[in-house]
A protein has these predicted regions:
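Metal-dependent phosphohydrolase cores
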Residues: 1-214
Length: 214
């Protein structure tokens, strides 16, 4: 993950991670240090992969229900064959296809991880100045992303997610797929069922996680 690695080695990113860890040392509620960011990255990516698998499975079942004589073995061979073809075709258009080749998958994973790593990057600014972390986060993230030469075609979506990820409830309007997974992972990564501060937590009882999901 080229850009995630660059971000993890960026001095300002590391400094902010250390600073937020120090500032939240005595905090009884949810923390926002690197371990949480990585939880969000991993959970969001797993959710995405699970849904991709379900999409393939649904497609296969629909073919069977339509009495298309495609055995499971033949179906897998077809997908594998197309996968090999895509790998060998540099200019292939994958945007409308229900599967990802290896290069696309690695690139998407990189984008997921960079976005997850940055989603709470504005916390230090919020603690120090009162500026909301989503607002500060967009400003800081844009600077960091520019300095690691993050792809311009990914920039807008990542900054959008950094700016709105904190909402726990569904809102009007459409989310990008990555935004949907990052928002869910940010919420579901919290172990409310094992939290000693739950009695005074600002989350409503129905919002609290009662078990593990991923």
């Amino acid at each position: 993950m080229k850009f995630a690695e660059k971000l993890l080695k960026h001095p300002e990113f590391l400094q902010l991670q250390k600073r937020v860890q120090e500032m939240e040392q005595d905090r009884i509620y949810c923390h926002h240090e690197l371990s949480h960011a990585l939880d969000v990255c991993r959970m969001a990516w797993m959710m995405y992969l699970e849904d991709e698998y379900k999409t393939h499975l649904k497609d296969y079942r629909q073919k069977k229900e339509a009495k298309v004589e495609v055995s499971e073995q033949k179906y897998r061979a077809e997908i594998a064959g197309q996968y090999i073809t895509d790998l060998q075709t540099d200019d292939a258009d994958h945007t409308e296809k229900p599967y990802l080749n290896a290069d696309n998958m690695l690139a998407k994973k990189d984008q997921f991880y960079v976005t997850g790593l940055l989603h709470d990057i504005g916390r230090v600014a919020q603690y120090e100045t009162g500026e909301h972390h989503s607002v500060a986060g967009v400003r800081i993230a844009e600077k960091l992303l520019t300095e690691i030469e993050y792809p311009s075609e990914w920039m807008r979506e990542t900054l959008q997610i950094v700016g709105v990820h904190h909402g726990r409830e569904e809102t009007d309007g459409e989310f990008s797929r990555m935004e949907y997974y990052i928002r869910r992972a940010d919420h579901l990564s919290r172990n409310c069922f094992f939290c000693e501060a739950s009695d005074s937590c600002k989350w409503k009882k129905e919002e609290r996680n009662q078990t593990i999901c991923w």
